[in-house]
Every structure is written in structure tokens, then in C-alpha cells.
């Protein structure tokens, strides 16, 4: 079978693209929400009950923003500057340690 006359062009294009593109499903930096505080328009906010928490980290895993981090003991801490009040954390919590309450400003 004869070699494609375009093989060199294809290989060069693949090399150029591979140098410019990141591997799939990897986000090296979050979107602009880290730069721009996004919690100012929230209607509900998560209220955390430490006594009910089993440290399963589902709230941390499912939070679509960088709004939850873990303290030294592994408990979630909510960064209200970035929390949009979506309620995903409360919905995913198996022990209902997170309750969404109306934001009072």
C-alpha cells in the first residue's frame, strides 16, 4: 500500500495541535469566577451543621464553583464570596448537614 502524500502534513499538524492543546477533561485553571466574586446575587446560602457532617466530601466534590474548601480537620468551609446559592451541596449531603436558608443582607 502506498504511503499518503499528505502524511507529513498531517503529522506536522498533529504535532502543532498537541503542543497547543491540553489533554481532554483537564481544567488547568478555573473560569473567571476565581477572579470575579460571584456570590453577591445569591438568594439562598448554605448553612452548615458540623455535628451532622460525616466528612464524605460530596459537597466539596459537587460544588460547581470554588466555594467550598476543607479545613484542617476535613470539614467543609463555605466561601460566600463565590457561593452562588445553587443548593447542590445541600442536595448531595447524605446526612442533611447543609441546609439552604434565605440570604439576609
Swiss-Prot record:
Domain 4Fe-4S ferredoxin-type as annotated: residue spans: 44-73, 74-103
Residues involved in [4Fe-4S] cluster 2 binding:
63, 83, 86, 89
Going by the UniProt record, its keywords in alphabetical order are:
4Fe-4S, Electron transport, Iron, Iron-sulfur, Metal-binding, Repeat, Transport
Instruction: State the free-text cofactor note.
Output: Binds 2 [4Fe-4S] clusters.
Judging by the UniProt lineage, the source's domain of life is: Archaea
Which PROSITE patterns is this protein grouped with?
Answer: 4FE4S_FER_1, 4FE4S_FER_2
Cofactor(s), names only, from the UniProt record: [4Fe-4S] cluster
Query: Which SUPFAM superfamilies is this protein grouped with?
Result: 4Fe-4S ferredoxins (SSF54862)
One annotated GO molecular function is: oxidoreductase activity, acting on the aldehyde or oxo group of donors, iron-sulfur protein as acceptor
**What residue intervals traverse the membrane?**
none
Any Pfam family: Fer4_21
Provide the binding site for [4Fe-4S] cluster 1. Answer: 53, 56, 59, 93
Q: Entry's PANTHER family?
A: PYRUVATE SYNTHASE SUBUNIT PORD (PTHR43724:SF2)
- Give the matching NCBIfam families: PorD_Arch, PorD_KorD, PRK09624.1
| Subunit text | Heterotetramer of one alpha, one beta, one delta and one gamma chain.
Protein's name according to its UniProt entry: Pyruvate synthase subunit PorD
Instruction: Tell me the name of the encoding gene.
Output: porD
Amino acid at each position: 500500500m502506498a504511503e499518503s502524500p499528505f502524511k507529513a502534513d498531517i503529522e506536522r499538524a498533529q504535532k502543532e495541535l498537541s503542543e497547543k492543546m491540553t489533554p481532554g477533561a483537564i481544567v488547568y485553571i478555573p473560569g473567571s469566577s476565581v477572579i470575579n466574586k460571584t456570590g453577591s446575587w445569591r438568594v439562598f446560602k448554605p448553612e452548615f451543621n458540623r455535628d451532622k457532617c460525616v466528612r464524605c466530601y460530596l459537597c466539596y466534590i459537587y460544588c460547581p464553583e470554588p466555594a467550598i474548601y476543607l479545613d484542617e480537620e476535613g470539614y467543609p468551609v463555605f466561601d460566600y464570596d463565590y457561593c452562588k446559592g445553587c443548593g447542590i451541596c445541600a442536595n448531595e449531603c447524605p446526612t442533611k448537614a447543609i441546609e439552604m436558608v434565605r440570604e439576609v443582607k
